[in-house]
Amino acid sequence: MNAEKSPVTPNVDHEEIAKFEAVASRWWDLEGEFKPLHRINPLRLGYIAERAGGLFGKKVLDVGCGGGILAESMAREGATVTGLDMGFEPLQVAKLHALESGIQVNYVQETVEEHAAKHAGQYDVVTCMEMLEHVPDPQSVVRACAQLVKPGGDVFFSTLNRNGKSWLMAVVGAEYILRMVPKGTHDVKKFIKPAELLGWVDQTSLKERHMTGLHYNPITNTFKLGPGVDVNYMLHTQNK
């Protein structure tokens, strides 16, 4: 799974792209398929801004930006934001929403590996949220993110742990019982253990700074960040 990719073999899962293309028009529907992303975005944004020492005036790259929920919110914080995605329809939605909102975001359709070949060391902050589990070679994405950030810059990852609890919560619970996301959104075999992600990070110039869990309470229908990384988790790293 972690073999080196040649320049002519993009790190893309076309089935995964198709899933998100099919529902792209509803990306900004606060009650639609992406409702959970809208709900957790303030937590993500707050964590990123706090750990990075603010976003104002910084050059930020959002890898796997989709319809632009996080990218747009970081631009509102005063960052100069580029959003990368390989899905044409989500990017069209992102561009239109930014235009309607009067927000400047530069959206680009290319892989992070392609972007790294042209823009190495150009970003103060790189974010990669819930994207690693949707590509054939997540380690390649981690390497590219490390190449893109400036010395001393910050890189943030979020993904899902691979264990019985995460399968129960993220697949059975979220997709089939609570129907928070469309069925088939997640494949537990592609989930990533924190030790695996940290192992990939250790093979780059990045250094782990902080890790936190993202927790959902079905009784109160609320999300929060806190200790425990057995389901969703976020990782803050910094370039050496």
Curated annotation (Swiss-Prot):
Its EC number is 2.1.1.222, 2.1.1.64. It is an enzyme of class 2 (transferase). The keyword Methyltransferase applies. The keyword Iron does not apply. GO terms for biological process: methylation. InterPro entries: SAM-dependent_MTases_sf (IPR029063), UbiG_MeTrfase (IPR010233). S-adenosyl-L-methionine binds at R44, G64, D85, M129. Keywords: Methyltransferase, S-adenosyl-L-methionine, Transferase, Ubiquinone biosynthesis. Pathway: Cofactor biosynthesis; ubiquinone biosynthesis. One of its GO terms (molecular function) is 2-polyprenyl-6-hydroxyphenol methylase activity. It catalyses: a 3-demethylubiquinol + S-adenosyl-L-methionine = a ubiquinol + S-adenosyl-L-homocysteine + H(+); a 3-(all-trans-polyprenyl)benzene-1,2-diol + S-adenosyl-L-methionine = a 2-methoxy-6-(all-trans-polyprenyl)phenol + S-adenosyl-L-homocysteine + H(+). This is Ubiquinone biosynthesis O-methyltransferase. It comes from Escherichia fergusonii (strain ATCC 35469 / DSM 13698 / CCUG 18766 / IAM 14443 / JCM 21226 / LMG 7866 / NBRC 102419 / NCTC 12128 / CDC 0568-73).
